[in-house]
């Protein structure tokens, strides 16, 4: 059953069943598929993804670090106005409203592989909670560096990383950094280490270290922080952070909060590593439009999660094969890479057992130039899922 779900493409469910069972007259019905699918759980797909990744060691940055990008993405699912957790009212993106789930993924940028996933109803998304859960159950060892955008900047996220003994690079807004430092303006360039004492009380008389009063930061009961008891106002938590401010383009500066030491990572090193985070953005494009994660075959959120996990497994399967395909270097203007779209189609057939004569040789025939300096504005599209009715059959 899991093999079937992983190998599904963008056709209708009947078509996918026919292909998987090689057009046998005893092919299972849709109803039989639904009954067997209900016996599965998300934990089975999570276990399969982890065990599959562990069979193929991840590539390390500088021979030591795993660079793990974390980011969110959205997937439109079948319209159901009666589901308040996923339904969005009509707006500029949709005239009839739409249903959506939100995902937060971990992606190792050097190996080009997904490591873990959190799926949340679109209306109940909580990226802070998601990345904390992903850090808590990280299971790949080594020296991971979590890299995330400014939407993940929070005291609770920093503390979870420190408590789980993982490093991080997280971009932060100017306003947040000003509050950390207790200043009104920021210099163009900055590289400093700060110590903050987090507490649930605003009373200076109850602070344990009055000589460090400027380092105290108050967290109210309504703000999640898992290492302070909300009912114990005497509880305190020491947080040590490094703040680096770098120029990303002419006159444009960004703040990056990290736990990496100055001895091991200069500001330029941090800027370089953070820029590698863009790999997860391009992987979302391949995941949605090449692997076909937008062409779902399920309506219920639980079963949508099955398909999203299966797309990650399939993406990793294709990525592992593609990264082992040698691309011949020739005297050309550009460096070249494998055409992921065509390579994925070949890997699809290979997974189904329709083995081409030589998978790696066939994939290496289809290559594309690498143009690293290309930039395009992000397009805003109408929010609409792929219909169950109008698909290739």
Positions of PLM-derived features:
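Single, function-defining residue in the core of a domain
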Residues: 1-11, 19, 33-40, 44-48, ...
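Short alpha-helical "recognition helix" segments of helix-turn-helix
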Residues: 16-23
